């Protein structure tokens, strides 16, 4: 049986798919082949809504899945279909800077400086980029700024963006491989992966305010009912909450929804933004 999967992060799901294929065969005796599509969350949502057959979607934010739901492909109430508002893991927004932090970037207001060039994806195509936008807005709102002033700050910030890639991975490539920009606004897991892949070349800066990002998962009801794949699709998403999959999420620098497993990967560091945690690099 084939399972079409539109997803957010290639490394996590490449490993998870192997885990799930083994699990499904052990449980049912059936082999399953998972066909994947990866890209900016907003763009992926539009492609599914416009006819790309996917049995399941794992996207950056609830709103992208609502786009598919609004097209009639996913039943309303999808956030209650799985535990933790159908978010099996979470992340937050941090800054990735080059070794030594040469521009001394500490917080969101530093991204408004004329000498700082920023890399972040395009909020029109990337769900992750919308979390970046919200985190910046949240910071300025916390400074007591008016909506008018915050809007001007956001304009300034985006005027400092060198390249608006369509997705988070494209922005990481622009910053890491192409060497463009002074700071990458990134999901925590993306920042840690970059540090793992290029040891000693980058540093993570934790801004004073951020947001808790909740990637959402859903079964595409119209597709699974038409294809007769509901059982495997639902189990694919349910198994994300298994101990094995939760550990895999932590190993890929996400914050597992299972708090007992999450504790294996973080140390507490409080801020006023969220109940903030730092994932430590797995040994």
For every predicted segment, state its role.
Residues 1-71, 81-82, 187:
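Early extracytoplasmic/lumenal segment of secretory-pathway proteins
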Residues 51-57, 116, 178-183:
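Alpha-to-beta junction loops
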Residues 8-11, 41-44, 63-66, 101-102, ...:
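Solvent-exposed loop/turn segments at secondary-structure junctions
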Residues 143-208:
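Ligand-binding pocket segment of bilobal, Venus flytrap-like solute-binding proteins
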Residues 87-92, 153-158, 164-166, 197-230, ...:
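Periplasmic-binding protein-like
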Residues 2-6, 278-283:
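Short, small-residue-biased leader/transition segments that mark boundaries at the very start
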Residues 69-142:
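A conserved helix-loop-strand patch within extracytoplasmic ligand-binding domains
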Residues 224-279:
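Extracellular/periplasmic juxtamembrane helices and adjacent flexible linkers that interface
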């Amino acid at each position: 049986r084939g399972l079409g999967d539109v997803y957010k992060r290639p490394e996590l799901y490449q490993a998870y798919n192997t885990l799930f294929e083994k699990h499904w065969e052990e449980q049912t005796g059936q082999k399953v082949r998972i066909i994947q599509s990866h890209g900016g969350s907003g763009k992926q949502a539009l492609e599914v809504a416009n006819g790309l057959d996917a049995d399941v979607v794992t996207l950056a934010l609830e709103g992208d899945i609502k786009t598919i739901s609004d097209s009639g492909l996913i039943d309303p109430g999808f956030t209650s279909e799985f535990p933790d508002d159908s978010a099996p893991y979470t992340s937050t927004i941090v800054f990735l800077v080059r070794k030594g932090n040469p521009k001394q970037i500490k917080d969101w207001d530093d991204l408004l400086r004329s000498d700082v060039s920023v890399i972040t994806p395009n909020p029109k195509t990337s769900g992750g980029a919308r979390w970046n936008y919200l985190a910046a807005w949240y910071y300025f709102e916390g400074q007591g700024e008016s909506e008018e002033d915050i809007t001007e700050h956001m304009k300034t910030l985006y005027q400092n963006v060198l390249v608006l890639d369509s997705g988070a991975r494209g922005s990481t490539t622009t910053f890491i491989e192409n060497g463009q920009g002074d700071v990458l606004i990134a999901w925590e897991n993306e920042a840690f992966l970059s540090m793992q892949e290029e040891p000693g070349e980058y540093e993570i800066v934790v801004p004073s305010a951020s947001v808790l990002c909740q990637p959402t998962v859903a079964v595409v009801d119209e597709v699974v009912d038409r294809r007769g794949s509901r059982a495997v699709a639902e189990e694919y998403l349910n198994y994300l909450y298994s101990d094995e999959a939760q550990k895999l999420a932590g190993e890929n620098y996400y914050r597992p929804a299972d708090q007992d497993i999450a504790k294996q990967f973080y140390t507490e560091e409080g801020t006023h933004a969220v109940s903030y945690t730092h994932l430590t690099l797995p040994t």
